[in-house]
């Protein structure tokens, strides 16, 4: 704190000789934290700092009530924070009971549910006698507390996902695949929301705002290139539209393929060869060539129609506003190559992680896409966002395919398979580069995994995305991280 800032507060018009003048809010050091067997070093240092402050003549530390966020960094982008109202806030919310001393929800759920959480101030108007004591009450308005809001979020799961991914530029969504309850929403790196309550110095703000990893950026609200996690969606569209069957053999093309010479130098590449080249194997080996061919068989018109029906270029019905998934920059797939690239989650396809998780719910709910929700409901029943988008037989066939991705030893998600239950999932590595020959581009690593059995006592669906996985294992890096989360969720098998 600068001396001139302190002087400014001390010389305010309301200040009297015996006034306690608030200068800055600081975190209270709790005695229990200091008595821990291995107390946090930052807490110990803060205690020493406060002891030094109290040795300064005229300095006092007084307790005040402020909003506290116990999950701190773990749920910053989800919960958000409140701040003191600005002149703009007062103008925008004129007549809604805000004063210069009010706080208001700025981001996250604090902003979404500001009206419900705010409550109403109380007041009393009275006539005072010459000594300032109440003589006659003229009017009285009782304080009305804000509502308590209970979420579907599992705090332990939220914390575990954050812990596992906190050093990455990532986002994760966790849902109950049979109800639509959202169990976790994590964006990393993150920040301590309590810092906004206590007040930040310019230096602190600049450090946070200029961090190259962008801790203030909410990644789970954005759209990203999905890579191979999109292949089960293409599989379902192809089967539903009868463009092909699961047993159609697309033929072995080796590691590189193009439809014909009209594609110029452009080729679709894949990593593995196998036989027969049918849907189940294409999912197991994550074959780009198979799904490029699948997209061409589906055709542009059917692809656009089906993806639109799945909620692309539309808003997600959810408490927090999410960016809209899209299959093209202008709602139309422009070329044959663009259509082929769409088949394996490249091209201009961008998907919101929550949206992708919702689409995956259709594979274990007879082809119905469930509506996600955050507000807890007793004895909640699943609500359908998009009904019967796929038939029961189609969703079952795709589900069997993505079970194999995790449980077949050749599957790209085999590292997460368990002996005590069947999981289903799909890996994805999306390339972000200027051209096919560009070797300087980055990669996004994806993994979607779920418990497809309704009898599972702890059902879960996780979609995780990590930026910059090139050179550190691609999607395998994400599989490893999610495995640790599931081991904690279920217990190691």
Residue positions per predicted region:
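Short, gly/Ser/Thr-rich active-site loops of penicillin-recognizing serine hydrolases
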Residues: 382-384, 479-493
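Beta-lactamase-like hydrolase cores
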Residues: 13, 156-176, 181, 189-194
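Envelope-exposed proteins and targeting segments
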Residues: 57, 74-77, 145-149, 168-170, ...
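Conserved, well-ordered alpha-helix/loop/beta-strand core segments that scaffold catalytic motifs
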Residues: 130-171
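Membrane-proximal periplasmic segments of bacterial cell-envelope enzymes
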Residues: 1-134, 142, 170-171, 177, ...
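Beta-lactam-recognizing serine transpeptidase/beta-lactamase-like catalytic domain environment
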Residues: 129-138, 178-229, 233-466, 474
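Short, charged, low-complexity patches
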Residues: 106, 356, 474-486
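Alpha-helix C-terminal capping segments
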Residues: 49-54, 161-166, 374
């Amino acid at each position: 704190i600068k001396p001139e800032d302190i002087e400014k507060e001390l010389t305010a018009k309301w200040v009297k000789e015996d006034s306690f003048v608030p200068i800055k809010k600081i975190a209270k050091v709790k005695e229990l934290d200091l008595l821990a067997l291995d107390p946090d070093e930052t807490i110990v240092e803060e205690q020493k700092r406060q002891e030094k402050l109290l040795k300064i003549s005229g300095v006092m530390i007084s307790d005040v009530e402020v909003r506290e966020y116990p999950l701190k960094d773990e749920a910053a982008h989800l919960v958000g924070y409140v701040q003191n109202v600005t002149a703009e806030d007062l103008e925008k919310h004129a007549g809604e009971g805000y004063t210069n001393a009010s706080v208001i929800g700025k981001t996250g759920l604090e902003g979404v549910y500001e009206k419900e959480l705010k409550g109403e101030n109380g007041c009393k108007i009275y006539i005072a006698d010459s000594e300032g004591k109440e003589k006659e009450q003229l009017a009285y308005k009782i304080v009305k507390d804000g509502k308590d809001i209970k979420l579907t979020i599992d705090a332990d799961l939220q914390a575990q996902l954050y812990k596992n991914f906190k050093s990455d530029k990532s986002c994760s969504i966790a849902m109950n695949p049979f109800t639509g309850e959202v169990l976790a929403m994590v964006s990393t790196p993150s920040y301590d929301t309590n810092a906004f309550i206590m007040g930040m110095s310019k230096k602190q703000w600049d450090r946070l705002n200029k961090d190259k990893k962008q801790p203030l950026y909410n990644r789970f609200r954005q759209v990203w290139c999905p890579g191979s996690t999109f292949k089960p969606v293409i599989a379902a569209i192809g089967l539903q539209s009868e463009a092909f069957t699961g047993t159609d053999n697309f033929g072995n093309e080796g590691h590189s393929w193009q439809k014909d010479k009209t594609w110029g130098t452009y080729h679709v590449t894949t990593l593995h060869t196998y036989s027969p080249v049918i849907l189940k194997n294409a999912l197991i080996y994550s074959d780009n060539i198979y799904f490029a061919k699948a997209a061409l068989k589906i055709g542009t018109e059917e692809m656009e129609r089906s993806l639109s029906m799945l909620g692309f270029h539309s808003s997600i019905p959810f408490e927090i506003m999410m960016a809209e998934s899209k299959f093209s920059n202008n709602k139309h797939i422009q070329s044959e190559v663009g259509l082929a690239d769409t088949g394996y989650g490249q091209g201009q396809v961008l998907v919101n992680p929550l949206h992708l998780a919702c689409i995956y719910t259709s594979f274990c709910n007879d082809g119905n896409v469930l509506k996600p929700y955050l507000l807890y409901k007793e004895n909640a029943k699943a609500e359908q966002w998009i009904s019967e988008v796929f038939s029961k037989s189609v969703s079952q066939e795709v589900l069997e395919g993505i079970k194999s991705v995790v449980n077949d030893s050749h599957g790209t998600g085999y590292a997460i398979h368990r002996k005590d239950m069947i999981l289903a999932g799909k890996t994805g590595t999306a390339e972000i580069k200027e051209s096919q020959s560009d070797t300087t581009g980055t990669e996004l690593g994806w993994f979607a995994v779920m418990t497809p059995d309704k009898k599972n006592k702890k059902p879960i669906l996780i979609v995780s995305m990590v930026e910059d996985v090139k050179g550190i294992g691609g999607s395998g890096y994400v599989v490893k991280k999610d495995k640790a989360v599931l081991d904690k969720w279920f217990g190691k098998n």
